[in-house]
Regions:
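Catalytic cores of nucleic-acid endonucleases
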Residues: 323-324, 347-391
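Hydrophobic anchor at the beta1->P-loop junction of P-loop NTPases
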Residues: 23
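Hydrophobic positions on the alpha1 helix immediately C-terminal to the Walker A/P-loop
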Residues: 34
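Interdomain motor-coupling "hinge/lid" segment immediately C-terminal to the ATP-binding subdomain
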Residues: 118-120, 124-227, 260-263
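Short glycine-rich substrate-engagement loop in P-loop NTPases that contacts/grips substrate
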Residues: 53-83
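Conserved lysine of the Walker
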Residues: 31
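Accessory nucleic acid-recognition modules appended to NTPase machines
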Residues: 180-339
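Pre-Walker A adenine-sensing motif
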Residues: 2-16
């Protein structure tokens, strides 16, 4: 089992803190394995095995349904003394009312509770009712490039060679653990995607027109890294002779977001210092999702470079926005408490244009500014703007 230190360090920070730790992310991103890592770590730290209760609540195991009371009782029966019990509860969203059971265990027993889940039922409004102020949400993503390199050890290829593979095959752990060609890797990812779409969206929300839903998904995938609106999608469908209300498009976007398939990136007005509500971008939970749906094409690489940088910033705890500086756009403004960085992303620096650098130089503050590129020869510093190769940026500890 390959350790993912970022998540283990976070879980150690919150160990024995009276909060429910909720690990949430797309299916197969590694949440269950993180619970296994946690169990091993607890054992190494001297916790008795019979005081670590691991429960898995998959739909296959509980197809007939389980009540919150049965969930509570099933766990409580295993707690045979007054010592502290560590509860590792996997895929709890399959239990209706799990929040009530977990809240009761938090209040009425000596417990430290960790749960995982992969869809909107995990983050339902019931959490606000039963767990307000009593949980911490820990987002789990597919592998970062640094984690991908760990998964590939002892591969003799250089980081930049492995970056090309990471760009094409993505970061789902199951893919990284194998030696798959593109076709096989995309078949695996397609299986994950179909499972998410079927189990977390179309069945749950009773979507009848599957073809129309798929067309909306395809539009989003085709437009990763571009600003658009629900209204734009509705108009596009109308131009194809299909009819879907703007409200329905909003619902589709919302459901995809709650299943952790897409992530919304809002615009931030650098002049007015405010978040704008229009013309957002959406990024995919993993670059491989685009390729399993659309196939790999070299022209799509720039958008997926953005996708990878966006998630690297999120993994590091930044709130990430698109920057609007009057009429100019900055790919990313990443904010963390009182700190921020600005990032432009391009495949290579244009020889006859300084747009990427010039847009950053127009921002009159002293926060770090980066242009991230695949250009091997472009590394350097232009008037304080750092030009960095993508591999170096993803592995850097300077931001």
């Amino acid at each position: 089992m390959i350790i993912r230190p970022q998540y283990m360090n976070t879980l150690k920070t919150y160990r024995d803190v009276p909060l429910v730790k909720i690990l949430a992310g797309i299916r197969r991103c590694g949440k269950s394995t993180i619970l296994d890592m946690l169990r091993d770590d607890l054992l190494k730290s001297g916790i008795a095995a019979d005081h670590i209760l691991s429960m898995r609540y998959t739909s296959e195991d509980f197809d007939g349904g389980m009540t919150d009371k049965a969930m509570y009782q099933g766990i409580k029966e295993q707690m045979t003394d007054d010592g502290r019990y560590y509860l590792l509860l996997d895929e709890v969203q399959e239990i209706d009312g799990w929040e009530k059971a977990v809240n009761s265990l938090l209040e009425n027993a000596n417990t430290d509770i960790y749960v995982t889940g992969s869809n909107s039922k995990l983050m339902s409004s019931e959490i606000s009712t039963y767990l307000t102020g009593r949980y911490i949400s820990i987002p789990v993503y597919t592998l970062s490039f640094a984690e991908y390199l760990d998964f590939k050890k002892p591969d003799s290829r250089s980081p930049k060679e492995l970056l090309n593979e990471y760009l094409r095959l993505g970061g789902f752990p199951i893919v990284a653990l194998g030696s798959f060609d593109e076709r096989s890797a995309y078949q695996i990812v397609e299986g994950i995607y179909n499972s998410v779409i079927t189990n977390d969206i179309t069945k749950r929300h009773n979507i009848m027109n599957f073809d129309l839903f798929n067309r909306v998904v395809k539009y989003i995938v085709e437009n990763v890294g571009k600003t658009f609106s629900a209204n734009a999608i509705a108009k596009f469908l109308k131009s194809e002779g299909r009819s879907l209300s703007v409200e329905a498009v909003y619902n589709y976007l919302n459901w995809l977001e709650k299943a952790f398939v897409i992530y919304r990136c809002q615009r931030y007005d650098l002049q007015g210092k405010s978040v704008l509500k229009t013309q957002e971008k959406f990024y995919l939970a993993d670059a491989s999702l685009k390729y399993c749906i659309m196939g790999f094409h070299p022209t799509s690489i720039v958008a997926m470079l953005e996708n990878i940088v966006y998630f690297e910033l999120r993994r590091r705890g930044y709130e990430v926005y698109i920057g609007k500086n009057e009429t100019k756009e900055i790919d990313f403004v990443a904010v963390q408490r009182d700190e921020r960085i600005y990032v432009q992303v391009c495949r290579r620096l244009p020889e006859e244009s300084d747009r990427e650098v010039a847009n950053l130089l127009e921002i009159k503050d002293h926060y770090p500014k980066y242009v991230v590129t695949l250009d091997e020869l472009a590394a350097g510093n232009i008037n304080g703007v750092k030009i960095v190769h993508l591999a170096d940026f993803l592995l850097s500890n300077l931001y």
